[in-house]
Amino acid sequence: MTAAFDGPPLLVANAPDAPDWRPDLRTIPDVRPGLGSLGGIYTAVVEAPAPVVCVAWDMPFVPEPLLRRLGAGLREHDAFLPQSGGRRGVEPLCAAYGPACRDAIAQSLEEGDLRAIAFHARIGVGILPLSEVGRFGDPELLFFNVNTADDLEHTDEMWRRLESSPSSGGRTPERPR
């Protein structure tokens, strides 16, 4: 993400040892703990000095050019999300959020609606169509979440395939440390 935005990312994490994960990053806990993913998005919007592009920690295959494209979408929208084949149809944990999202998210949190897309009706949301997302890679791979030991093992296999694939053209995302 540093390469995508000319500055270090902000790590929003609640684990007591989170600052040890990446000591080179500013790490902050949720400003309103216990509110799930929406609470994390809210924290990023509140704490960052500018609009933010959020990427879930467990999405290792999101490439820099996609992050840049999402950030560019904020020129015309309050939030900009990639379309996906997931259950929501969009990926709110790999998306760009502008300052207008702050109050809209706060209202959803106050109402107890913790869905990551709960505040979308209150702001101008843009969607990066799946056809354009596909230009950055296979959406299923791009938005793959690592939630279990099996997922982690599968991730290692996918990294090896990506790194050895001639079709990647050297465009594989930076491999996590």
What are these model-derived regions, one by one?
Residues 144-146:
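Conserved anion/nucleotide-ligand pocket segment
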Residues 149-177:
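SAM-dependent methyltransferases
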Residues 1-113, 117, 121-142, 153, ...:
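Nucleotide and nucleotide-moiety/phosphate-recognizing core
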